[in-house]
Amino acid sequence: MVNSCENKIFVKPTSTTILQDETRSRKFGQEMKREKRRVLRVINQNLAGARVYPCVVNKRGSLLSNKQEEEEGCQKKKFDSLRPSVTRSGVEEETNKKLKPSVPSANDFGDCIFIDEEEATLDLPMPMSLEKPYIEADPMEEVEMEDVTVEEPIVDIDVLDSKNSLAAVEYVQDLYAFYRTMERFSCVPVDYMMQQIDLNEKMRAILIDWLIEVHDKFDLINETLFLTVNLIDRFLSKQNVMRKKLQLVGLVALLLACKYEEVSVPVVEDLVLISDKAYTRNDVLEMEKTMLSTLQFNISLPTQYPFLKRFLKAAQADKKCEVLASFLIELALVEYEMLRFPPSLLAATSVYTAQCTLDGSRKWNSTCEFHCHYSEDQLMECSRKLVSLHQRAATGNLTGVYRKYSTSKFGYIAKCEAAHFLVSESHHS
């Protein structure tokens, strides 16, 4: 038998003697194979000179009979079915290693197996994990992301006052619901000044501007100022007053508000003094009787201030925002045209405009909308008017509010830049 490794040609012997020797050698080789067969569970263990991963062989010119070829084919299928799965790292490690040639058979007869390294590599079956590799899909490539509007949670603004008995947390919602019901009784007709014979809108503005200065000089609380203005408007909407009595109406309204809100009430003589003795003590007392009877002693009506406190709390405003909102709402007190807005709307607009002024952008969250019961669109008309008042607050003759809030006591808040963008947006729209 001639075997050429270079040409890979197998020459079959023809002599009868050689055939007999071949038969004996084949039987001996088969016995050797049976002795060397191992159990399946250790079939992958390395043998001396053997490959870890079973290689693919190409038989050329074999002398095996058809029956032996079928048996080997069955064994190969069984072997493939029992072979453990091959991982990606194992395949890469094995392909990177240099293939070693098989150990030649001990006898010169039997199966002559020749291994072509290049063909073996090409014929190597791909493991199941690599035949159909799973590529994780990128959701950004397959699905177009849609803008999802996440609702902003509503903050419980009363949770910090749960242990404060004076805050009346259990009843605060009912209280402000009642204020909303009653605020319509505190509103006056927007054209009531037309019924006055000797008065006009400018005279009212002069009176309110002067009372704001008096209120600041006496160091009275904010509730007193808002109640004073409310009493004046309600009285003038029901009673004709001469021009020379208008200042007296303002002094009496301030006196009644102090009696209702303040702990320490100014004496009548002090009020006469600040009027430059234009009125006497009896004039003050007589006007007090007239005003109470005209209003039917109905003093306690909600003004802008209780709403302002509640809405500032809902906005979680800092001190600067509180002062700016107070400045804006006091500017509105002077203007007669602002009477057409209900107290709650005016308070909410003051908070909204103050936030926009400080932040430089429109700001109104779901918590503010929930507690104020006004959307941002409902506030825009009133807000633009407040910005206009802020822009011209330092000019003209009525600058009492501007001078009050231009002091260090109020952090010079009146000098801050107005929210011009709110007015410009209305012009563009």
Swiss-Prot record:
Gene Ontology MF term list: cyclin-dependent protein serine/threonine kinase regulator activity
Chain segments annotated as coiled-coil in the UniProt record: none
BP GO annotations: cell division; mitotic cell cycle phase transition
Alphabetical list of Gene3D superfamilies matching this protein: Cyclin-like (1.10.472.10)
Pfam families per record: Cyclin_C (PF02984), Cyclin_N (PF00134)
Tissue: Expressed in roots, stems, leaves, flowers and siliques.
Keywords tagged on the record: Cell cycle, Cell division, Cyclin
Organism superkingdom: Eukaryota
Family: Belongs to the cyclin family. Cyclin AB subfamily.
Subunit comment: Interacts with CDC20-1 and CDC20-2.
PANTHER family, per database record: CYCLINS
Record protein name field: Cyclin-B2-1
Organism expressing this protein natively: Arabidopsis thaliana (Mouse-ear cress)
